[in-house]
């Protein structure tokens, strides 16, 4: 009897051939060049102070904080969505389906509903930021830990329950919003729209290391994600505990989505948009090739939208207008091409 060598997750090949690898490198370098160009443009364009003066660098420094926020948001959405697609075996859904945005809206609406206009101030600050993050992570973790712990439930059941619970939270939020004073509602609306200006720079020293740690963990476990993408039976035969690995990845996804949603507000289609484009550009199932492309696409999209809105339409920070428009169109195109969810 001939013994065969055990198959491992590291036996997969990232690229088909040298041409495939070269095309991926060209796309990666091109995105890096575009990203750097947009960073320079956002920092220097329309700066009223002479180049090199103290005033010029003070203005540039204030703009750098927005660039850092966009980098954090792009990384969180890109890595979370790609990982979420892997464990759910569905490239149409997004992590928002677990109810992060609905819960974020409920928390902020309840604060304004109970405390009035002062509630918008209460929801800002380090303590409030981490409170929202903890609530979102706990909600998502309890949801899929409970549903995936039973042999009678699966990922699809978890997604359906998430949709129903998200709809319920959104209905409660809408009910409270209808009872608000018009002025209070205007204040609340500005908070509920994904906006780079919503981010408080005092959150960054906490958000950056947490997001970076989770992102590094996902990169380090890229081979395991490659195995998970092959399905439960195959990943189990490769020596992985499929259910445990799925829960670990979902915990990482929930942390990333909670951090970015609490930081800038909801951006429903950002992750879906960059992940869909990354799959087409990378043209591989290797997460080590997909992750950097997805992150750079997200960063280019955010910085490009920020530049256009800031210097053409003078609507600083409201990048969700462009992101949701493009993302929604791409979503419809993908649905029409596939003909199913």
Q: Could you describe each region identified by the protein language model?
A:
Residues 1-341:
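Alpha-helical transmembrane segments in inner-membrane proteins
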């Amino acid at each position: 009897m001939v013994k065969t060598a055990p198959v491992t997750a590291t036996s997969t090949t990232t690229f088909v051939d040298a041409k495939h690898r070269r095309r991926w490198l060209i796309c990666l370098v091109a995105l890096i060049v575009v990203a750097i160009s947009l960073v320079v443009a956002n920092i220097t364009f329309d700066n009223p102070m002479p180049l090199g003066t103290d005033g010029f660098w003070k203005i540039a420094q204030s703009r750098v904080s927005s660039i850092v926020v966009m980098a954090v948001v792009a990384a969180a959405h890109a890595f979370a969505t790609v990982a979420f697609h892997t464990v759910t075996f569905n490239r149409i859904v997004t992590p928002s389906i677990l109810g992060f945005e609905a819960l974020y809206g409920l928390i902020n609406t309840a604060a304004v509903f109970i405390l009035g206009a002062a509630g918008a101030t209460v929801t800002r600050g380090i303590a409030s930021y981490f409170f929202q993050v903890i609530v979102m992570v706990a909600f998502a973790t309890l949801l899929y830990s409970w549903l995936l712990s039973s042999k009678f439930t699966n990922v699809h059941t978890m997604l359906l329950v998430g949709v129903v619970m998200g709809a319920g939270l959104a209905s409660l939020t809408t009910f409270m919003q209808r009872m608000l004073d018009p002025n209070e509602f205007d204040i609340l609306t500005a908070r509920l729209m994904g906006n780079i200006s919503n981010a408080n720079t005092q959150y960054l020293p906490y958000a950056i290391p947490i997001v970076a740690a989770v992102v590094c963990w996902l990169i380090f476990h890229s081979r395991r994600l490659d195995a998970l993408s092959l399905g439960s039976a195959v990943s189990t035969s490769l020596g992985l505990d499929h259910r445990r690995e799925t829960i670990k990845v979902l915990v990482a996804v929930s942390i990333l989505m909670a951090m970015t949603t609490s930081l800038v507000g909801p951006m429903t289609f950002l992750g879906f948009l960059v992940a869909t484009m990354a799959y087409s550009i990378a043209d591989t199932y290797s997460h080590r090739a997909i992750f950097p492309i997805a992150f750079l696409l997200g960063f280019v999209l955010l910085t490009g939208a920020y530049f256009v809105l800031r210097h053409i339409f003078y609507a600083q920070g409201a990048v969700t207008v462009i992101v949701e428009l493009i993302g929604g169109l791409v979503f419809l195109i993908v649905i029409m091409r596939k003909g199913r969810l």
